[in-house]
């Protein structure tokens, strides 16, 4: 911030912009000091912090007060922030890799994302009081179970990479009879998912084996060598669509747990993972109306088959009745929670991304099943139109089956193509 002239016009009203954001004004500080029996806020610092830590001034400890320019008025601060932001180069993102541009309906933006009643309580501290929030999370859970065709979903996790690593840990807990501490993952995972899974595996002593799950000659020997689970992206990070059911069948035969990492929007068109043999489904719900936000935060999802209910991380919302016999929402299976299970818990008060799960649920309600399918159809139709145009231009599109991500073989010209796209604003 630059130096600002004091607000002499009196246009900000009785409570200036600075006091709303900086904190207590001088009169407040004086009152606080008198109430607790000190002469000034500086005395609190001198009494609490060792003299060796404070700045020395002529042999005596003193508190150095930073020198700041006068506080800016709201309009001035906004203008300066706009000026700073104008230095950014705004382009259209085509990279994908788990983050996709989406439209947030204005009714959701106004009434949820910009509504402090929703965004201040980012997780239900006293959940049963927040019946409206629990109702929206119930809708979110139903959305996930409907699209994945699995029995139960939690009310969100922190992000897709976290959900994938939590799925790995769930598989290790659930496959107790499997003596092999090996976990198989597809070679074509999103980078952030691979990094988090590998990091979590290293900390917990799990051996992660990367193999091409689309090639039986690659994955079959690894499964036969023993594993407690597998993580199969559907579609994978290259955009390729494939059927993981053969891999899932093989892993089940050795006692392992199967995890499908799915694009939620694509599941409005594709066969659900529950019908392909997945025990667990994970992924991101960012495409359901949540802005990219420079990479996050985004609500992840996890759903599981029957029998894994007590292994799933994240909060579970159920429907019960109150003292008068009326329907009421409450958290269910709380024996998994930290306040009961302590260090053995699979869930705690922050194992969620509630606000953005609410946004995703509202997005699904706003568009309805037909609207979601129409959006997915538009996305994949445009991707196939682009692929056809690229083939007509002489480029080699690597995969015939895809949802919305296209891989192009450029025969050594990738850098030139990248530069031309960047010059064009992409």
Where are the predicted features?
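Charged, compositionally biased N-terminal leader segments and the immediate start
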Residues: 1-24
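Active-site C-terminal subdomain of aminotransferase-like
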Residues: 288-400
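Gly-rich Lys/Arg/Thr-decorated short loops/hinges at beta-loop-alpha junctions or inter-strand turns
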Residues: 115-127, 145-150, 178-180, 201-202, ...
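Conserved PLP-enzyme active-site core in the AAT-like
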Residues: 162-326, 408-411, 415-419
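N-terminal entrance/gating region of PLP-dependent enzymes' catalytic architecture
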Residues: 24, 49-139, 145
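Short loop-beta-helix segment that forms the pyridoxal 5′-phosphate
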Residues: 125-129, 133, 146-166
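Flexible, glycine-rich loop/tail regions that form catalytic "lids" or insertion modules at the edges
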Residues: 8-15, 82, 100-101, 375, ...
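Conserved PLP-binding catalytic core of the aspartate aminotransferase-like
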Residues: 393-421
């Amino acid at each position: 911030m630059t130096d600002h002239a004091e607000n002499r016009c009196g246009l900000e009203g009785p409570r200036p912009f600075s006091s709303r954001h900086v904190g207590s004004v001088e009169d407040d500080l004086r009152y606080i000091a008198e109430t607790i029996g000190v002469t000034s806020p500086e005395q609190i610092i001198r009494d609490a912090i060792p003299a060796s830590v404070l700045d020395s001034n002529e042999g005596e400890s003193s508190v150095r007060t930073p020198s700041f320019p006068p506080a800016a008025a709201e309009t001035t601060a906004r203008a300066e922030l706009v000026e700073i932001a104008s230095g950014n180069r705004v382009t259209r993102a085509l990279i994908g890799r788990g983050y996709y541009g989406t439209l947030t309906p204005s009714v959701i933006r106004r009434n949820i994302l910009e509504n402090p009643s929703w965004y201040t309580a980012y997780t239900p501290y006293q959940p049963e009081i927040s019946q409206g929030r629990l109702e929206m999370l119930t809708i979110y859970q139903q959305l996930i179970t409907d699209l994945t065709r699995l029995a139960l979903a939690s009310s969100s996790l922190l992000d897709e990479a976290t959900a994938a690593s939590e799925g790995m840990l769930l598989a290790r807990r659930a496959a107790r009879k499997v003596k092999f501490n090996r976990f198989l993952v597809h070679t074509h995972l999103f980078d952030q998912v691979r990094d988090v899974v590998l990091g979590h595996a290293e900390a917990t002593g799990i051996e992660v084996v990367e193999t091409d799950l689309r090639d039986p000659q690659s994955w079959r020997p690894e499964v036969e060598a023993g594993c407690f689970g597998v993580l199969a992206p559907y579609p994978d990070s290259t955009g390729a669509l494939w059927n993981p059911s053969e891999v899932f069948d093989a892993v089940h035969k050795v006692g392992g747990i199967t995890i499908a990492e799915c694009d939620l929007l694509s599941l409005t068109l594709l066969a659900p993972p529950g019908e392909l043999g997945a025990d667990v489904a994970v992924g991101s719900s960012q495409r359901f109306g949540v802005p990219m936000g420079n990479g996050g935060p985004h609500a992840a999802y996890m759903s599981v088959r029957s029998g894994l209910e007590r292994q799933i991380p994240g909060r579970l919302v159920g429907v019960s009745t109150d003292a008068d016999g009326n329907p009421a929402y409450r958290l269910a299976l709380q024996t998994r929670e930290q306040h009961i299970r302590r260090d053995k818990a699979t869930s705690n008060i922050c194992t969620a991304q509630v606000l953005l799960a609410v946004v995703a649920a509202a997005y699904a309600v706003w568009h309805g099943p037909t609207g979601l399918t129409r959006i997915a159809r538009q996305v994949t139709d445009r991707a196939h139109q682009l692929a056809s145009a690229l083939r007509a231009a002489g480029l080699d599109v690597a995969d015939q089956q895809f949802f919305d991500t296209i891989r192009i073989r450029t025969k050594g010209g990738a850098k030139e193509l990248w530069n031309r796209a960047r010059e064009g604003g992409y």
